[in-house]
Every structure is written in structure tokens, then in C-alpha cells.
Amino acid sequence: MWPGVPPRATFFPNLCKGADDAIHGLIRAGALILTGTDAPAPGVSYGVSVHSELELLVADGMSPVQALAAATSVAARAFHLSDRGLIRPGMRADLLLVQGNPTENILDTRNIVAVWKRGIRVQRQSATR
């Protein structure tokens, strides 16, 4: 979702409709759904594309809380990564601080204020390295 760039449905309307219908059905059925992107495919940026994925999951029927879990605790559990996915002592502590409340409005995940990687705050200019 870049300013001035048409949404994906403009280019692939039938493909997107089918994918949205499939995800909607899986959500209703209670299937285990994780976030995922096509990065590093052309036009798909690391990080930013996860925010778009969260927005699509909410548009397809997940609550914001379910979508956030799909990107964190559910994904960690699915890949047997017991040191991440939750905020509690002993965990890896890769964290985002955002302005707003993404459990109510998933768009607030884009309002990043600060980032911690393995418990250490990352300075903004080095975050892309």
C-alpha cells in the first residue's frame, strides 16, 4: 500500500478475490493462519509488507488481536520457536512500540515509535542494516 500505487486488486482482480475468499473461509473454519509475505519478490519490501498482510487478514475476517497473534505467538508456536512470540521474562524481546492501539485498529502497527531487537533498542538509522 504505497501512496500513488494502485492496490494489488487493480492488477490481479480475480486472483485477489479468490485468495480473499479462501482466507475468509479458513478464518471461519478456525484454521491456523500465519502472516507471510512474498519478500524479496519485486515490489514487496521486508517489514512494510507484513503491515499490509495484517491489514488484509483483518479485512478478510480476523480481529486485530487474531492478526497480531498470527504474526507473533502463533507463528512462533508453528515454527517451534519457544524463545519468541510472547512478551514475558526469558523471551527474545524483539518488540515494536507503536503510537495507537493495534488491537483496536490494525493500521496503528504502521505508527512505529521505537524498535527493540533481542532486548536492545535499535536506532532508527540502523534499523534497515
Question: How would you describe each model-predicted region?
Answer:
Residues M1-N101:
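His/Asp/Glu-enriched, well-ordered alpha-helical/loop segment
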Residues A71-S73, P89-R129:
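C-terminal cap of metal-dependent C-N hydrolases
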